[in-house]
Amino acid sequence: TDRTREIVAEYTATYPFIRLIDNPDRIVPPAMNKGILASKGDVIMRLDAHSTYASNYFSVLVKALYDLGADNVGAVCKTDVLNKTPKTLAIKEVLSNKFGVGNSTFRTGIDRVMEVDTVPFGCWRRDVFDKYGLYDVRLVRNQDIELNKRILRGGGKICIVPDTYCTYLARETFSALAKNNYGNGKWNILTVFYTKQFDSLSIRHFVPLAFVLSLILPMLFSFLFWPLSLLSVLSLIAYTLLLGTISAKLSVSKKLHFGYLLASFVVLHVSYGWGSLVGLLSLPFQPKK
């Protein structure tokens, strides 16, 4: 419906080395695996839609891959929005802020080459997939993070470089932001469930779940001992104070809408944490894969 096939056909008419490979599974891991297995070169690079790439993206990453002796390299992924309004600019800022996305280096920016636990998209030597395996086809999301953790677990090296960048076009409505992060949160739990490796993800991926549980669990157990409800109140007060302080500073320093900043942070954190909680509750009903 988005003219993908037509667009690819236009490119193949000009560049005959481009090939379109069908992916009936309609999720990322099988698509990547089909592409990797069909590849003929020494370097694999993943480029996702809804993103744009700097003109030197290819050359910088391929050079860094060999110069650094890395198994995977990537660059900072800047966040932007297509339609710039007070709401979308607030969402953009929240998705680039440490209070929004944690210590996610590739989102918050770097000024030097760093070894990291994951990078967006990726640039690998082809033989890396022979050594560490292909994408895990069970994972609808987080498949890139899981692959990178597997590489590190096997003694590999992942680097992020500052000399190029890509730009991700973020969701522009609160409903779309919530839907996306609900799915991310849910698949954090399912990723650990299917891989049986807690370190398939990082601690930051579970902070929203901890926040949501800090609100819900004390209230549930307060039926047995009512003072426990105060823990929920304290958690909410602490979050509100932190949220208000950070949003106020961003509003003043970057001239952004205070209310939209508040709403963006809350939607991001609560939808992500709620998704993780739903994922946790769904574990007894998950099929074995």
Region annotations inferred by a language model:
Residues 1-6, 25, 48-52:
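A conserved acidic beta->alpha catalytic loop
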Residues 5, 9, 28-37, 148-149:
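Short, conserved alpha-helix that lines the donor NDP-sugar binding/gating region
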Residues 20-39, 60:
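Glycine-rich, basic loop-to-helix element that forms the pyrophosphate-binding segment
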Residues 44:
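Short aromatic/hydrophobic "clamp" motif used to bind/position activated sugar donors
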Residues 56-89, 93, 165, 169:
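Conserved donor NDP-sugar-binding/catalytic core segment of glycosyltransferases
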Residues 79, 102-127, 139-140, 146, ...:
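A recurrent flexible, glycine/aromatic-enriched loop bordering the glycosyltransferase active site
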Residues 81, 136-199:
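Catalytic donor/gating beta->alpha subdomain of glycosyltransferases that bind UDP-sugars
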Residues 210-285:
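Membrane-embedded multi-pass helical conduit in multi-pass membrane proteins
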